[in-house]
């Protein structure tokens, strides 16, 4: 089969709150998704009991349906209609912009749909049938979100995906490029848990103000070291010489009191050079354009979520039988989800994982082992080693049977400038872009369902090409 046009590839990533959509890939580099829409649709009931679906509630009589909750599809009919809404909207938009679009990018659209681990086999087959028979799309791949995350890292063989959602967090182990379905685990805590904690600290604030604080650049998670160093005073350090130069002429011509100008300038310089963690108070803007002042609460609210995630990760990964695979998984932790864009969140979660699960040789055992190793060395070697430290290569190390002895975050790719600029909280979508380009622009059709395969086997064709 001939490769598809890159500007014809459609990627849809449905989630509980919002859905990310991109139609057409950039020829030169991958970019962040162009559309983020609420995962919802309106439904009205006819007299015969059947339903009709709408994008808006024009007459205020329609029922609002959110077909996905905690990643799981709870209304498959509403979900398929939601997919239709997206597809028809794209067709309409492109056709209005270009009358010849149906002979170009709209002539043959391949769809990559990112799926959640909780979707049942029945859900996946119903979606497949709807895509081919109702939407009349001729080529489809359903890609699990966990595998999309691994491909964003250029195909990690062993890793652990921690996907922090709004109301839940998924922990998904990947071993030998395969999702371990029997070990996939979820906890009923996510970004909303942070809001709930902040609400207790700031009971006078409404929900919108708390959400605005959480999304503001001044909201961050401080490491233990940063908390110790944070003094909350207005020290003014490392000022540039240019910033210390007075413009006397400007002060004179301004007509203002000299002392007032100097005091204002000094305050500005101090605030400019002080870290957020050193300020007793800082301000942010809410969605209504109001400037709001907040204290230490901007560093709080995440601890409980982080501790619970760390605990569940440990319980999950302890069930991996192969010790070598388990070690490799611990060395490639991938943290994704909108909540992880909070400054310091990933680092704090890594710190908690190290604190809770890292296996370190006790100091007494280490000292005893080093002394025993030195005692069996030849005399000549001892003379040579008297100027060496205890960490010389002569002292053997112990390979512990338990794991983890190393816990690390997987290295994010740095050769996608647009993604690097915006952050990697939605890196699952980047993985989908990589996969779609590799598969849909390749002449072989091994990894996706074609119209020919569907006509032969129907929705069951999905299981012959599952990625």
UniProtKB/Swiss-Prot annotation:
The keyword Hydrolase does not apply. Disulfide bonds: none annotated. Pfam families: Actin. GO terms for biological process: chromatin organization; chromatin remodeling; nucleosome disassembly; positive regulation of transcription by RNA polymerase II; regulation of DNA-templated transcription; regulation of transcription by RNA polymerase II; transcription elongation by RNA polymerase II. It is found in: Nucleus. Coiled coil: none annotated. One of its GO terms (molecular function) is structural molecule activity. Keywords: Chromatin regulator, Nucleus, Transcription, Transcription regulation. Gene3D superfamilies: 3.30.420.40, 3.90.640.60. The keyword Transcription applies. SMART domains: ACTIN. It comes from the Eukaryota. One of its GO terms (cellular component) is nucleus. Belongs to the actin family. Present with 1790 molecules/cell in log phase SD medium. PANTHER family: ACTIN. Component of the chromatin structure remodeling complex (RSC), which is involved in transcription regulation and nucleosome positioning. RSC is responsible for the transfer of a histone octamer from a nucleosome core particle to naked DNA. The reaction requires ATP and involves an activated RSC-nucleosome intermediate. Remodeling reaction also involves DNA translocation, DNA twist and conformational change. Forms a heterodimer with ARP7. Interacts with LDB7 and NPL6. Component of the two forms of the RSC complex composed of at least either RSC1 or RSC2, and ARP7, ARP9, LDB7, NPL6, RSC3, RSC30, RSC4, RSC58, RSC6, RSC8, RSC9, SFH1, STH1, HTL1 and probably RTT102. The complexes interact with histone and histone variant components of centromeric chromatin. Component of the SWI/SNF global transcription activator complex. This is Actin-like protein ARP9.
């Amino acid at each position: 089969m001939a490769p598809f046009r890159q500007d014809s590839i459609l990627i849809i990533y449905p989630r509980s709150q919002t859905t990310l959509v991109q139609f057409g890939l950039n020829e030169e580099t991958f970019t962040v998704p162009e559309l983020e829409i609420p995962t919802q649709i309106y439904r009205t009931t006819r007299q015969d009991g059947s339903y009709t679906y709408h994008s808006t509630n024009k007459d205020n009589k329609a029922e609002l349906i959110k077909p996905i909750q905690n990643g799981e599809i709870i209304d498959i009919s509403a979900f398929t209609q939601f997919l239709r809404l997206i597809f028809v909207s794209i067709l309409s938009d492109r056709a209005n912009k270009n009358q010849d679009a149906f002979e170009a990018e709209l002539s043959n659209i391949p769809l990559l749909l990112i799926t959640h681990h909780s979707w049942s086999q029945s859900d996946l087959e119903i979606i497949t049938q709807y895509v081919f028979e109702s939407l009349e799309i001729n080529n489809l791949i359903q890609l699990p979100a966990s595998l999309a995350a691994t491909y964003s890292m250029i195909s990690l063989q062993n890793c652990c995906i921690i996907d922090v959602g709004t109301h839940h967090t998924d922990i998904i182990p990947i071993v030998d490029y395969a999702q371990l379905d029997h070990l996939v685990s979820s906890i009923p805590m996510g970004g909303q848990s942070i809001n709930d904690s902040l609400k207790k600290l700031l009971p006078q604030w409404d929900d919108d103000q708390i959400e605005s604080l959480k999304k503001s650049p001044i909201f961050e998670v401080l490491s233990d070291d940063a908390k110790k160093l944070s003094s909350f005073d207005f020290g003014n350090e490392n000022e540039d010489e240019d910033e210390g130069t007075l413009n006397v002429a400007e002060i004179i011509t301004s007509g203002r009191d000299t002392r007032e100008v100097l005091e204002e300038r000094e305050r500005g310089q101090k605030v400019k050079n002080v870290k957020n963690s050193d300020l007793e108070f800082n301000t942010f803007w809410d969605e209504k354009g109001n400037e709001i002042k907040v204290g230490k609460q901007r560093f709080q609210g995440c601890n409980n979520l982080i501790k619970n995630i760390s605990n569940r990760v440990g319980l999950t990964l302890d069930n991996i039988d192969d010790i070598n695979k388990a070690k490799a998984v611990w060395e490639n932790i991938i943290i994704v989800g909108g909540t992880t864009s909070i400054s310091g969140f990933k680092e704090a979660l890594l710190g908690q994982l190290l604190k809770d699960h890292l296996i370190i040789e006790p100091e007494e055992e280490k000292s005893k082992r080093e002394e025993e190793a030195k005692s069996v060395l030849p005399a000549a070697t001892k003379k040579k080693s008297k100027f060496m430290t205890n960490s010389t290569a002569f002292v053997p190390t112990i390979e512990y049977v338990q794991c983890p002895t190393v816990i690390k975050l997987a290295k994010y790719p740095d050769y996608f400038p647009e993604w690097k600029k915006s952050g990697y909280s939605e890196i699952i979508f980047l993985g989908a872009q990589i996969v779609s380009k590799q598969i849909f622009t390749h002449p072989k059709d091994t990894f996706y369902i074609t119209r020919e395969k569907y006509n032969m086997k129907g929705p069951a064709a999905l299981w012959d090409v599952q990625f």
